[in-house]
Design a protein with these regions (language model features):
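Charged, amphipathic alpha-helical coiled-coil/dimerization segments
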Residues: 65-123, 136
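Short amphipathic alpha-helical/adjacent loop interface patches that line ligand
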Residues: 14, 53, 97, 128
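N-terminal helix-turn-helix DNA-binding core of bacterial DNA-binding proteins
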Residues: 18-59, 70, 86
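Pre-recognition alpha-helix immediately N-terminal to the DNA-recognition helix
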Residues: 12-16, 33-39, 95, 122
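Short, leucine/isoleucine-rich alpha-helical interaction segments at C-terminal helix-coil junctions
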Residues: 17-20, 24, 70, 115, ...
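DNA-binding alpha-helical recognition surfaces that contact promoter or target DNA
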Residues: 62
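N-terminal leader segment of winged-helix/HTH proteins
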Residues: 1-32, 133
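C-terminal regulatory/oligomerization modules of transcriptional regulators
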Residues: 1-7, 118-137
Length: 137
């Protein structure tokens, strides 16, 4: 059975959901991606960030410079190799990310609570579990 219509609808709905989350964010997408990576992985070099994000090192250097100017990241010497500099999320950057996540979670919680009944919430949970299986490797 051809699942193309389901795949297309899923892609559209997920894209709409992502756009809705981005509405509550003041940080541009490239900077947000870097902050998310730093929250997950901890301090890393600009070249490592570029490789992880799939961008040129020059582009990443520009993004990191913007984050440094905004006070959202800090730069430190690598204790293992003093020739390299590590980029680390700052306390302000961490606060911004936590606040964004809190706002996004509150919006989703409110939408689920007010727009879905108990049975629909169970169905949504089952759907999330299925979607997770689609992306788990």
């Amino acid at each position: 059975m051809d699942q193309t219509p389901v795949a297309e609808e899923l892609r559209v709905v997920v894209a709409q959901l992502v756009r809705r989350f981005r509405q509550d964010r003041e940080i541009p997408q490239p900077q947000f991606n870097v902050l998310s990576t730093l929250m997950r992985r901890g301090p890393i070099t600009t070249s490592q960030l570029a490789a992880l994000e799939g961008v040129r090192p020059q582009s990443m250097a520009h993004t990191v410079a913007q984050l440094l100017t905004a006070g959202l990241v800090e730069r430190h010497s690598d204790p293992a190799d003093g020739r390299q500099m590590l980029i680390e999320i700052s306390a302000s950057g961490r606060t911004s990310m936590v606040e964004f996540r809190r706002t996004a979670d509150a919006w989703v919680n409110d939408a689920i609570s007010t727009r879905l009944d108990a049975e629909e919430r169970k169905t949504l949970k089952a759907g999330i579990d299925l979607m997770r299986r689609l992306v788990d490797e």
